[in-house]
Amino acid sequence: MSSEPSDEHSSKQSDPVASPVARPIDCVLSSVQFLSRLPIPSSLANHNKPDFENGSWSFPLAGMVICLPALAIMIAAYLLGLNAEVIAVLTIITQALTTGALHEDGLADIADGFGGGANRERKLEIMKDSSVGAFGAVALVLSFLMRFVLLSSLLDLSFFTAIAGFIAAQVISRSVQVWFWQSLPAAREDGLSSAFGTPSKQSAQTALLIGGGSLLLPLIADVSIFSLAISITLIILFLVGFRKLCIDQIGGQTGDAIGAIQVLTEIAFLIGLLTFMP
């Protein structure tokens, strides 16, 4: 056997698209690597720029992987007999550490930019500033407070409902990210889309299908179909409203906006789950 494979064979080995089995795994690992601080073995890690035009469909699956450390903490805290409030705090802290507060950073930048900029250019300039202003601080506090109240309320109702709702929220919110990213033009030339491309329509549709499939988890946990309907309605309202706001304020999407919609969608979904609950 030759030690120097032909060009054709070499390209098939190096290109993850060439393997119908390896490609989905490669996409999920690339998304986990991009969206979190979870350690990926060097042999499995993607050392090249990820192809999110074709691979962003895996964001919701990555969301399921990313929430595993927080889920483990939630279960361990429950088995130790801790109350709902403590479990919720530990879960939220673990999730923020796992993601590096990536999406919360986007929410804070959006709040500062939209709240403090007088025009489009100034808003985009503020959003690139790494410091957190008053609007960003308020947005961060409110977002963490809302998730604490919502998760602890679900834990008070049912531990299994809280687990199902938490997992589904991580999956659905990241499927919405992909659709949001695909549906809007880039607001700046040096933004996320210029670096990684824009998700294809097929990627966005696949992500939404995966997100929709995660709704089975709350149903299995005896969440009312009416509660899920409210959750979906709230997600759509949040998505449509935030999408219009981004168009009006900066003319499209940025990485910060894509991060912010994840947090907003997660909150909207959890609010809906608590409706019609006994």
Task: Describe the role of every protein-language-model region.
Residues S2-G100, F114, N119-R122, D129-Q253, ...:
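Hydrophobic alpha-helical transmembrane segments
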Residues D105, E125:
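Glycine/small-residue-rich loop that forms an oxyanion/phosphate-binding "nest" at active or ligand-binding sites
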